[in-house]
Amino acid sequence: MTDRLHPTRTIVTGASGELGQAMARQLAQPGAQLSLWGRDGEKLAAIAAQCRAQGALVNVRSLDLTDVAGAVAALLAEDDACPFDMAIFASGLGDIRAQGALVEDPAQVARLIQVNFTAPAAMAAALAGRMAGRNSKGRLVLISSAAAFHALPFAASYAGSKAGLSRFTDSLRIAMRPHGVSVTLASPGFIDTAAGRAVPGARPMPLSPEEAARRILRAAMAGRKGMGRAHLVTPWHFALLRLFDRALPRFLRDRLLRSLAPPGW
């Protein structure tokens, strides 16, 4: 990574996950200040040690983003202490309905929506307003999923929460652009992580966490006047699948999406 891809102070949520860890490693260099948030304290400590070995100054915060108000308060407190140049909201939960069930568990639906949509949207909104008022503008990166493009009957809460985040991010980008704040939406396909491999079903064209992180960070720094790409879909094949989904008659699309469920689901 080149120096221009390393903002001075960055927060990465989901930093105990494999994608978030890859983001942190690629941002870590002498002079970089990283705030790494995640659920797993042991994994946070391990990635923090790696980033410090690369010369970065690192602090960690272990928390559950289902406490949305607490997460926003903690974010603003850290921003008060030392303003963020960049925020990467990479936290997320993935799940499908239980085998044999007609619908997903209501408590799990609520949890996925809080972690995948409500928390990152609220945190991004809180930070965007502050960044807009600064002389040195900031960057926001929100990680959605190619699953947001499709109505997945066996993963309604995951696809739905990511779709909500995608529309929110695009709306925020339009609102913030006149104020010089860059907002990038990333919609990766399958990322080869332990959590992803635990979910039954095919995973075509998987990206390693390191490659996904590299593509997302480059997209965040690209574009006219360095304002970042509005939307990264990677691998590009998933953009074609999105168009295919839109072009199909509804009855054919519904039949196809039902057929994607793992056997027995």
Regions found by a protein language model. Give the residues of each.
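Conserved glycine-rich cofactor-binding loop
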Residues: S16-G17
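C-terminal helical subdomain
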Residues: L185, G201-R242
